[in-house]
Structures are given as C-alpha cells and as structure tokens.
Amino acid sequence: MKTVQRPLWFVLVAVLALLWNLFGLFSFYVHFTASPEVIASWPEAQRQIEAATPRWIFVPFAVATIGGVLGSLGLLLGRRWAEPVLLLSLLAILVQFGSIYAITPTWALTGIGGAILPLCIGLFGLFLWWYAGKAASRGWLR
C-alpha cells in the first residue's frame, strides 16, 4: 500500500498525543514510586483511595500509559501498528478506571468531579484509537 503525504495537522495531533501520554507515564511513575511520606502529604480522600487500591491496578495503568506513549510515537512515525497499540491502551484505561471505581471508595470520596479526568482520559484514548484507524484508512500509516 502506498503511503500518502500526511498533513501538518496530523503531525500536530500526534505530537500532542505523545505529550499527553508522556504526562500519563509520569503520573504512573509518581503513583508507582510514591513513598509513604509522599502519600502522607496527599489530601485525605486521595490517601483513602490509595490505601484501598490493590497493587495489581498498576498492571493496566502501566499498559495504558506505556501503550499510549508507544501508540502515539507510532502515529508520529506513521506506523500502522499504532492502531492496535492504541486499542490495547484504551482497553487498559477501561480496565484500570473501571476497577478503581468498582473496588475503591473513589466515587463516594470524589463524586462527579472526580470522574471528569478519568472520563477525559478514556475519551482521548478512544479518539486516538479512532484517529489511528482513520489515518491508516487514508494511507497515512505504513
């Protein structure tokens, strides 16, 4: 399949996606390496959520963030494998946040306001997967 010239806005979206996902990877690092002293400095609600969160939640968190970075890098490089990697990232986002809301007191402690960021993360993950599919169908990925 012949690769078609990608428009500038495609590259801009890919760069923004990479930056967004690098921020997510940093968030993963901060949560994964947080010492008891750091956790003690967090607001009470966040400490309760952290205490109730099982360690296995870090597996989908890692898959979501690393997959997001790799998928965004794949988009930037114009690689077709970006689409399935971004799908894997999206699925991991759904598992991560679905599990957190199912087994921790997140909803009770943060209410609707606490759901805004996870919702935005999920929607952006969905957008990136869709965007990669459109880019592949237009011949922008090889």
Residue ranges and their predicted role:
Residues 1-142:
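Topology signature of small-to-medium multi-pass alpha-helical membrane proteins
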